[in-house]
Each structure stands twice: as C-alpha cells, then as structure tokens.
C-alpha cells in the first residue's frame, strides 16, 4: 500500500502479505534452516529416526531424508525449496539426501552472518558460485577409480548406504542382494555400464525376518492361478505374454443380434465357445504351458486352459508384463492369432506359493534375466518399508559406481578435504568474495560435526582432531563414529560414489543461492475454503516462522 497526499493507494488485494529486503531474507533463511535442522539428527550411522503421523493416522518411521521431507506437509515456499533439494538428490544420485539438505541449511546460516556484516547478497552469491564450481574440481581430483567387477568395493558402498537404517543388523546380507541385483540387470555397451533400476522390482510382504529377504532371478507377481484345476507348479516353463483379454470381444458399435429361435441361440453360444477354444488351442499349439494375460480370462477359456494343463494368470499389471518380458525373453503379443513359438519366454520354474498367507506367482530360474525381484520380508509393516528404502539406496549407490567407476571416502572425509582446499582457494580469489568462499568452506564442516554430535561425541574436540589428522595423513581421513577417533575411511570400508557428493554440493549451493536472491515475498491471501479447512488443522495463513535456532 502506498500513499499519495495522505490518500492510501491499494496496489495489491486486501489481505496480501509482503516482506521486503532483510525481513524477506531472514524469513526465508530461517524457514530453510528449520527444515535442515529437522533432518540433521538423522545423519550418519548413529543418526536417529523420525516418526511421522499423517492426518489419517498412518505412521512412517524412517531416517531417510527424502522420505521425511516428502511425508511432511510443508507450507512455507522457501522450505519447499529444501524439499526439492532432497527430491533432486534422490532422483540424480539415490543417496545423500540428508547431506544435501544439511549443507544447504548451513550455507544459508553462514550467508546470514555475512549479510549481518553488510555484505551484499550479490557478493555472497558470486562467492558461493565460485566455491561450488571449485568443489566439483576438487572432488574429481580426489576421487578414486574402480573397476566395475570390483565386487568388494560395490559391497562396501552398498553397506555404507544401508548403515544407520532399521535394516542395519542384516546390512551385509542386504548389500550382497543389492549388488547382485544391479549386476544382473546392468547392460554393457562400448565398455560402459548402464543400469535401469526400474528393472529391479521390490515386492514387500510382512512376516518372517529381514534375513528371509530373497533375490529372485526373475519376477514375483502378487496374483494367483485363475482356476483351481490348473497346475500350481510348472517346470521348464514356456511362457506366453498376452496384452489382450481371452474373452469374446463385444462390438464397439451399438449392434443388436435378433434371436428368434432356440436353434439360433444355441448356434450363437456354440460360436462363442468355438472362438474361445480356438484362442486356447492357439496357446497350446505354439507350445506354451504358462500364460500371463494383461486383461481378463473368460470362465470357459479358464476351463480349456485347465484341461490342457496350462497355468494362467490374469489382470497382470503392465509394468509386471514388461518385467516378465525382460526376465524370460518373451515378447508381449497383442493379438493372440499372431502368437508364434518364437514369442515364448523361458524359465526353470513357475510356481504359485503362499507367502504370509497370500498366494503369489514366482517366475524364477531365468537364464539371463534383465529384470529381477527382491522379495522383502520383515516383522512389521514399518520394518518392511524401511528395509525397502535401505535397499533402494543401496541399489542406487551400486548403480552410480558401476556407471561412473569413481568412489570417494565417506565419514566426513570428503567435506573436510573440500573445506581445507576451498580455504586455500579463497586466498587466491581475494576481495569480498573471499569471505563468501571461506563461509562456504566453513559450512561444509557441518557434516563431520553432525556425524560426531549424532554419535554422542564432543563435536568441537572431534573436529579439531580429525582436521589435524586429515592434514597430516591425507584426504581419506574422516570420523570413525564407532571408535570416536580419526580413521582412514577407505580402509574402514566407508565408501560413497563421487556422484552422490557432487550432486549434494550442486543441489545445496543452487538452493542456497536461489533463496539468497529473493528480497521480496508477496503472499496472496488464501482462498476462503482453504482457510476454513485450516481452522481445525492448526494451519496458518502467513509464512512467518518461529524457531529456537541460534
């Protein structure tokens, strides 16, 4: 609202909130830091878990940064940017979501200190951009190359990703499953590996223990055999995949058939029966003894299939059909008349088994499966969900190493190395930007400091010891949170893909820079319906944040 000769001039609608300059920056920085502080305690092998309860009473227990932020109903626009950091990190690297968010929060904290010293945001932004660029170069220079067939390194990286999650007791076993699964679906082209992790299916079933989790060299489908007269087990299976219904199709036009005598009705029914029998005969003729159908199977067709001893499954999801094709080598056929013996896939065994009281179809023993399934077991729904998240992280980490062939030491070693090298770089740059680069370097120490804090160690004492040891012994020295001492992380098997660290620095610095660029927040008044809905839910119309962050 402006004033002209004492007369107010309304530019924005009534109820619109506006924060300008330092107020806007402070508010945005505070909101982003609250998000970082929320996930900070989950970082590292000794990190704690969060229990999230939604409006329906559903509970999620996890220490996965991306899941925590995804489950939280966040309103503040700057805080939502931090959620995007976690999502991007998860999508691009698969791990390091908490690291990225914590670094972004610390970069903003250090930036605020510079703003309080009257350093212009543009200078801070320029310094941060230079530092982020230099950090990428430093990470490339300290990364260690590994061969794709180095199973020990892949195993250690997968174990590092699983450590600290609910599945930790079985981390070695789960890491082996993750490595094996990725290696099975990996495709080599011109000496480089490409992994599509959509070809690894995670099927969850409560019951049993985490150690009962299994890798199936094929596909597990949460369906059952359609007819009780069909075989429940078929060895040396020849598999047909049909993307159509085994039913008599109805005409798409509004056609009417006028039947005037019982003979005509009988002829009509016989023709229907004949068409269905021809479909089943075609399946038998090409030599298939197992058939997966994406749509329905008529009762009469079921009868004929059972009579011929063919195992059939209906209403199979499209994604499962594609995985079956990749695992067995079968081709998905749209028109059953086009089915040929060459379209059939093969598997050692197709069997219906009871898992946790429910029937499931196991297609296993595929020769060279390019799609596999990990059947996850665990005592409760929450355990099974957290094991799935741990395995997803492990699988993505192994994928990163196979594709890039580069690793880096974990345990805060990379961040300490970056901090030391960026401090040196800041002196070369000089000017006011030097202060911003030094702030960036200082912000990276939040990772080793948080690892120590979460392990119950004295953060300052531990950090001083680790930095001294790091300068003396080299870039692989980090914090061993179990011993509380500096240690060579490569020797201890704490390994991460370089992609995870590079993406974390990239995402965190970009988010911090974007938030620092904002000097004006104009928030429109919420719609009446939304406001009414929030009255009972403790919602707030404005974006003001309050926190005890120092």
UniProtKB/Swiss-Prot annotation:
GO terms for molecular function: ATP binding; ATP hydrolysis activity; ATP-dependent protein folding chaperone; unfolded protein binding. SUPFAM superfamilies: GroEL apical domain-like, GroEL equatorial domain-like, GroEL-intermediate domain like. Residues 541-550 have a biased composition (Low complexity). The keyword Membrane does not apply. The keyword Chaperone applies. Residues 529-550 are annotated as: Disordered. Keywords: ATP-binding, Chaperone, Nucleotide-binding. CDD domains: cpn60 (cd03343). It comes from the Archaea. Gene3D superfamilies: GroEL, GroEL-like equatorial domain, TCP-1-like chaperonin intermediate domain. Molecular chaperone; binds unfolded polypeptides in vitro, and has a weak ATPase activity. Belongs to the TCP-1 chaperonin family. Forms an oligomeric complex of eight-membered rings. This is Thermosome subunit.
